């Protein structure tokens, strides 16, 4: 299972803005867009390509790269928090088809002091046709207990895409562990792996509720 933690200064700079309680709503939303764009370019480097030859305006032939997988991308947005993140992904991957998944959830308190299990119901999904050539990106800025993501993965896996990318800004150690146990072959891209969950299921140190901070 490829795990990519984007711990470069630019991504950590934007992560720090998101974590700060002093960051206003507009800046928070725009920062999610910026990180989405950066992550989108990282995904481009992981797609399949061919070496081709082109002719320049000076009549000289030059070898280059054609990323043919650009035509086979589906982005799934976990509503509503992923909306700005997906906006950024689309700036890097403008030909992607777009789908959405919306879920309601109820925390179930168990041991260890935080919601270890969660009842999740997918009450809406609109997903374009997916085939064996497609690269599917599932975007959710915060993955805490991973119950929603596991439900989404269950839907997407049945469609047998070429590969699946999970895109987040922060994922908890516990959420990461749950995903790896059930879907060890997915690609996970994140900016930070945070160590804890509180008794409400919030990631610590985290950044609060991404949807509320982005949209009010």
UniProtKB/Swiss-Prot annotation:
Keywords associated with the record: Allosteric enzyme, Glycosyltransferase, GTP-binding, Magnesium, Nucleotide-binding, Transferase
Binding site for GTP: 30-34
Means of activity regulation: Allosterically activated by GTP.
GO molecular function terms attached to this record: GTP binding; magnesium ion binding; uracil phosphoribosyltransferase activity
Residues where 5-phospho-alpha-D-ribose 1-diphosphate binds: 80, 105, 140-148, 209
EC primary class: transferase
The keyword Nucleotide-binding is annotated on this UniProt entry: yes
Pathway the protein contributes to: Pyrimidine metabolism; UMP biosynthesis via salvage pathway; UMP from uracil: step 1/1
Matching SUPFAM superfamilies: PRTase-like
Cofactor note: Binds 1 Mg(2+) ion per subunit. The magnesium is bound as Mg-PRPP.
Swiss-Prot/TrEMBL GO biological process terms: UMP salvage; uracil salvage
Enzyme Commission number(s) of this protein: 2.4.2.9
Binding site for uracil: 203, 208-210
Catalytic activity: UMP + diphosphate = 5-phospho-alpha-D-ribose 1-diphosphate + uracil
Cofactor(s) this protein requires: Mg(2+)
Keyword Hydrolase annotated: no
Matches recorded under Pfam families: UPRTase
InterPro entries: PRibTrfase_dom (IPR000836), PRTase-like (IPR029057), Upp_A (IPR034331), Ura_phspho_trans (IPR005765)
Entry function: Catalyzes the conversion of uracil and 5-phospho-alpha-D-ribose 1-diphosphate (PRPP) to UMP and diphosphate.
Homology family: Belongs to the UPRTase family.
Protein name: Uracil phosphoribosyltransferase
Species name: Sulfurisphaera tokodaii (strain DSM 16993 / JCM 10545 / NBRC 100140 / 7)
Encoding gene per record: upp
């Amino acid at each position: 299972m490829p795990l990519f933690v984007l711990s470069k200064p630019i991504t950590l700079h934007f992560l720090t803005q998101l974590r700060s309680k002093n960051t206003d709503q507009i800046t928070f939303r725009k920062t999610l867009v910026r990180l989405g764009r950066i992550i989108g370019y990282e995904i481009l480097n992981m797609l399949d390509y061919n070496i081709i030859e082109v002719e320049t305006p000076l009549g000289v032939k030059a070898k280059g790269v054609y990323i043919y997988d650009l035509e086979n991308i589906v982005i799934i947005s976990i509503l509503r928090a992923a909306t700005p993140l997906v906006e950024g992904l689309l700036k890097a991957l403008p030909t992607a088809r777009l789908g959405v998944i919306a879920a309601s959830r109820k925390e179930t308190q168990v041991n260890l002091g935080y919601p270890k299990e969660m009842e999740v119901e997918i009450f809406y999904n609109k997903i374009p046709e997916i085939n064996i050539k497609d690269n599917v990106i599932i975007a959710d800025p915060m993955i805490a207990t991973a119950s929603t993501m596991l439900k989404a993965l269950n839907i997407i896996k049945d469609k047998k895409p070429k590969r699946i990318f999970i895109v987040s800004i922060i994922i908890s150690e516990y959420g990461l562990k749950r995903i790896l146990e059930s879907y060890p072959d997915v690609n996970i891209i994140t900016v930070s792996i945070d160590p804890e969950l509180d008794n409400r299921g919030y990631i610590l140190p985290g950044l609060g509720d991404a949807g509320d901070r982005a949209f009010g």
